[in-house]
């Protein structure tokens, strides 16, 4: 009863798993961080000074993020250069909460938690496609 058992070396298994990762995930060594919104209230307007920087950190179209924020706070607004201008007075706390909600719904993969995602359209439906695990999750259309 002397069967030969072939145990895999952990390091070899780890190397094999690493080789299977997509190229864009292999080279992602930094922690995912979104810069905090720099909110200024001027009269009856709220200005998010670093709006485009935030959208770029999330790897999303600034217009998509703006559309979400405007719907969430029920107001009108525009993009001017690298900043967003909203009609009305909104606290930095409220803006930060809406950014977190956007991250949860349209950026972070609900399957593996990776921020390496993109929004794709198949027919009439929109999906959040994860570059790390390959999951496709249906999302609401804005």
From Swiss-Prot:
HAMAP family xref list: eIF_2_beta
Summary of the function given for this chain in its UniProt record: eIF-2 functions in the early steps of protein synthesis by forming a ternary complex with GTP and initiator tRNA.
Domain of life: Archaea
Family in the record: Belongs to the eIF-2-beta/eIF-5 family.
NCBIfam families linked: aIF-2beta (TIGR00311), PRK03988.1 (NF003067)
Record-linked InterPro entries: IF2/IF5, TIF2_bsu_arc, Transl_init_fac_IF2/IF5_dom, Transl_init_fac_IF2/IF5_N, Transl_init_fac_IF2/IF5_Zn-bd
The protein's assembly and partners: Heterotrimer composed of an alpha, a beta and a gamma chain.
Source organism per UniProt: Thermococcus kodakarensis (strain ATCC BAA-918 / JCM 12380 / KOD1) (Pyrococcus kodakaraensis (strain KOD1))
Record keywords, A-Z: Initiation factor, Protein biosynthesis
Protein name: Translation initiation factor 2 subunit beta
One example GO MF annotation: translation initiation factor activity
């Amino acid at each position: 009863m002397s069967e030969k058992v072939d145990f895999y070396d952990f390091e070899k298994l780890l190397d094999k798993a690493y080789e299977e990762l997509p190229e864009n995930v292999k080279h992602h060594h930094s922690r995912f961080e979104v810069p905090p919104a720099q909110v200024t209230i001027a009269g009856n307007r709220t200005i998010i000074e670093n709006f485009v920087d935030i959208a770029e950190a999330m790897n999303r179209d600034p217009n998509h993020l703006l559309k979400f924020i405007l719907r969430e706070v029920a107001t009108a607004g525009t993009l001017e250069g690298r900043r967003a201008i909203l009609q009305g007075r909104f606290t930095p706390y409220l803006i930060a909460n809406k950014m977190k909600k956007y991250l949860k719904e349209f950026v972070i993969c609900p399957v593996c938690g990776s921020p390496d995602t993109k929004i794709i359209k198949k027919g009439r439906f929109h999906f959040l496609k994860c570059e790390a695990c390959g999951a496709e999750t249906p999302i609401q259309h804005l």
